[in-house]
């Protein structure tokens, strides 16, 4: 069996939370003798996951379960606290609205900037820029500073860049839900094209119908732990049953 596109072994991620932080200098002096408590919040615990090359891989779970944290670790934006992550291939990611954009630069300048970050040279980006602008549909706004963009324009340009830099692995958090329905359809259709070209796609989504339609494998993450990985139909059904059961308990 070929190496997976992404291998995650024993990965955990913790963040330090400082409790009882003073709100003013005076309060800090008055309370100097009282100790602040520092707690570790574990966003992910002991995750083992292999994402096959060329797969369309879904991540599902409640808000705050750890899905987006996992994507940020895979993209190298954050570093895991323990464990190993191996990424085999050139990775492009669309994770947070406006991430990777410099607000004072124009859309066109940001296209070149993002290309450089992803290892594309200026000539390669010059060849792709017209296609990126056309796909994004933002027209003349490409020469305006991105700080004036709407959230929808950010998504359009971000997605257009992410899919036109020849990625071998594409990570997409739910940001495309911000775009209008036509653009969402365009994004999903383009991801299907990339998949047919052998690109590995990892998608975080709350739209379970979308996950069932698009994905060939799904991982369910709950409260920082990996519950199961498997066939989209079965995993989504068990996830829905668990949400329903929790709803009845409340």
What are these regions (language model features)?
Residues 60-62:
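The feature captures the beta-strand-to-loop junction immediately N-terminal to the Walker
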Residues 213-220:
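Conserved catalytic segment of ABC-fold P-loop ATPases
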């Amino acid at each position: 069996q070929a190496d997976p596109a992404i291998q995650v072994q024993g990965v955990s991620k913790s963040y330090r939370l400082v409790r009882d932080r003073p709100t003013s200098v005076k309060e800090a002096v008055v309370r100097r003798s009282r100790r602040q408590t520092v707690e570790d919040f574990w966003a992910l615990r002991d995750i083992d996951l292999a994402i096959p090359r060329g797969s369309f891989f879904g991540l599902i779970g409640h808000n705050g379960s750890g899905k987006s944290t996992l994507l940020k670790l895979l993209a190298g934006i954050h570093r895991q606290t323990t464990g190993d992550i191996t990424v085999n291939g050139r990775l492009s990611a669309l994770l947070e609205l406006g991430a990777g954009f410099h607000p004072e630069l124009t859309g066109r300048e940001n296209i070149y900037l993002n290309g450089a970050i992803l290892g594309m040279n200026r000539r390669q980006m010059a060849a792709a820029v017209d296609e990126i602008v056309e796909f994004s549909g933002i027209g003349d706004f490409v020469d305006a500073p991105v700080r004036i963009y709407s959230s929808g324009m950010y998504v359009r340009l971000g997605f257009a860049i992410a899919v036109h830099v020849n990625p071998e692995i594409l990570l997409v958090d739910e940001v495309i839900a911000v775009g209008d329905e036509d653009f969402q359809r365009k994004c999903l259709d383009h991801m299907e094209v990339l998949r047919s070209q052998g690109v590995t796609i990892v998608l975080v989504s709350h739209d379970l119908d979308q996950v069932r339609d698009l994905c060939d494998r799904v991982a369910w993450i709950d409260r920082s732990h990996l519950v199961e990985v498997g066939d989209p139909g079965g995993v989504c059904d068990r996830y829905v049953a668990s949400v329903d059961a929790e709803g009845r308990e409340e």
